[in-house]
Amino acid sequence: MSGIKRVHVIYKTHLDIGYTNMGQTVLDSYVQEHIPHAIDLALKINTPEHKKFIWTVGSFLVDYYKRHATPEQLEKMDEAIRLGYFRWHGLAVTSHTELQSPEVLAYNLSVSRKLDRAYGVHTIAAKMTDVPGHTIALVRPLSEAGIRYLHIGVNPSSRVPRVPEVFRWRRDGHEVIVHYSAQYGQAISIPGFDEALEFAHTNDNRGPQDAAQVEAELARIQAKYPGAVVEASTLDAFAASLEKIRDRLPVVEEEIADTWIHGVGSDPYKVCRYKALCALAHEWLASGRLTDDTPGYANFMCNLMLIAEHTWGMDFKKYLADFKNWTKADFEAARRTDTTTLDLLTNRNASLVGTLEYDLRNYCGGKFSGSYSKFEASHAEQRGYLKAALAELPEALRNEAQAAMDALVPQFDARGEAIAPGVTHTIAGWQVRFGGGGEIAYLAQNGHVWVRDGELGRLQYEVFDAKDTTLAFYRYNRDFAHTGGWAEADFSKPGLETAENLRHTCYAFALERLTQTGDTVIATVRGDGEAAEEYGSPRRAQLIYTFEQDAVHCRLQWFEKDANKIPEALWLHFGFDVENPNRWKMQKLGQLISPLDVVAGGNRKQHAVEKLCYSGADGTVTVESLHAPLVSVGSRNLYNLDDKIESMEDGFYFNLFNNRWGTNFKMWCSDDCLFDFVIRIETNPQI
C-alpha cells in the first residue's frame, strides 16, 4: 500500500469474563497461562530497537494480575512494562456503558490512571470490543480522564452504526477521536496520513500468538505495506499520531447507544440489586462516608463494574445447545434431566456444527457435555458479584447495604379498604382515576391534566414467535456467509418454529382488588391464565402507588412467575399527555440525551436510563427508575429492529424482563421481583 511509512501492529485477544467457561476459570487462565506467555514471548523476541510483539489488554487484567500473580511473575511483568512490551489501555473492561453509574465508570477509568502513576506512563487510548455501540455520555468522562482516542471493534455479525470510520465524537465542549471497526479490529489507513493501524487479534480468551505466528503476522503485514516500518505498537502511539490530523476528521454530535442493551433486562434480580448498590455508592461518596481511600473501596467498585461488563454467563452453544425443548412441559423435563447432547440441535443448526467443532476443541477439552445446571451456575456466579461487593464494605456500610438488599424481596401487601376503579379520587391533592389493569388512567394536578389519554403503570406480558425472532435476525445481523453458523444461535431462536401453536401475543393483567390506606393505593392484578400456564406470565402482581404533593411513587412487584424458554417480555407503560412529547430526554451517566438524536444503525429503540425527563411550557415531569434501567421508546420494541426513530406520543415502556438474547445471557426467570419508580411533576401556571 503506497504512501504508508509506518504501520502500528496491535496484538490483542478479546476478554470475556465468562462465555468460553466460568468467569473464574477464565480469569485463572489469564493469570496462569495467557499473561505469563505473552510476557515471556515479548522478552524473548523483542529488542529495544525492534519490537515484534507488545500485548495490549484492558487495565482490569493488569490490575487483577498484580493482585493474584506470584512474586516471580510480577517481577517479569514489571520488567515487560518498563520495556514497553506489555501495555494496558484506558478502559478496564468492555461494558454495557449505559448500565454503569457515573461512579462505576469513574472507577473503571481510574484503574488505568492508577497503573499510569505506578509505572510513569500516560495512557491516552482506550478500546472496547464486541458491543456495537455506546452512549455519547461517555465522551466527557473519557476526555476528563485524559483519553483522546477510543477504538470500538464491533461484533462481526452485528449491525454497525452508520458513522464515519474515524471521527471526533463531541459533546458539551469535550471530544474524543473514535475509530469504528466492523470487526474486532480491522486495518485502517486514512488518505493523506502516512501511518496505518493493523490488528493481530486472537479469538475470545485464546491468549497471545506464539513466536512463529508473530513472525508470520509481521511478514503478512510487511508484504501489504512494502517499504514501511512495520512493528508492534500500542494504541497510545497510534492515537498520538492521529492527533496530527485531528482537525481534518469529521465531527459527530449524535448519540449512538448500544444495540445489545436489551441484555440488561435478562436478570432483573441481579440488576435491581446492582442499581440499589450504585445508588448507595453515590450517596456514600457524596457524603464522604465512602472514599477511594476507604478499605475495600476498590474491590467493592470493581465488583459493581463486573456486573456491567458485557459477558453475563457461559455460552449457550457450547454448554447447553438445547434448541428443541420449547414448550413449558418439555423445558421443565429437560431441566430435570439436566444433561444435554448434540441431538438437541435441529436442522436449523446444521451450520453450527463446524463452529462447535472448533469451540469444543479449543475451549471444552474436545467434547460436548451440556448441562442445564452448569449453564445456570454461570448466571449464579454472575450474581455472586453482588455478594462479593457487599463483603468488601466496612461493617456499617455493609449492614446498610444488606438492609437495602433485604428490602428488595417482594412482600404481598394486603393493606387498605376497597375503593372503586373508574371513578375519580382526590389523594394528597391529586385527582386520580384507576383503570381495569391497575394503571392510573387519569391524573390531574392544580387543574392541569397530565394523564387523560395515556396511562401510568400499565403492566403487560408479551410472547414472541418464530416470525418475530427470524425477522429481527435478518434485519439486524450481517455477513451471513461468514457468521451465520454461530450468529443465528446467538441472536435468534432457531428451532422455535417447531412450537407451531405459538403466536405473538400481548397479554393484559386484570384488576382483582383496589384498596387505599392513607395516601397509598394498592392495585392487585392477576395475569392471564393462558399466559401463566402455557408460558411465563406472573400469576399475580401489585402496583403500589404512594401520592405526595409533587410526586407519585410507583412500586411494581410480581409473584408466581414460572421459568419459561419461549421468548417473552414484561413491560410497564408510562404515557403522559404532555404538550410536546418531542421534548422528552433520557438521563444516562448523569447527562440528558434526546431519543430523537440517535444515528442510523445505533439503538433508536431501547436504552438503559437513570431517568426520563420532560420540560415544556406546560411543566416538568421526571420518571426515575430505581431498579429497571431498560426502557423502550414509544412502543414495546424488543424485536422491532427497523432502525426508525420512534414517536414519543405514546410515552415509554420499561422492560422489566426479557430473554431475547441467546449467547451467554440468562434465558428464563422464576424470581419474584420488585421495581420502584418515582414520578415528579411540576405544573407551570398558565395565562
Where are these regions (language model features)?
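Catalytic and substrate-binding regions of extracellular carbohydrate-active enzymes
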Residues: A298, L306-E309, F316-E560, C673
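Catalytic-domain carbohydrate-binding cleft regions of carbohydrate-active enzymes
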Residues: M1-K367, K374, G518-I687
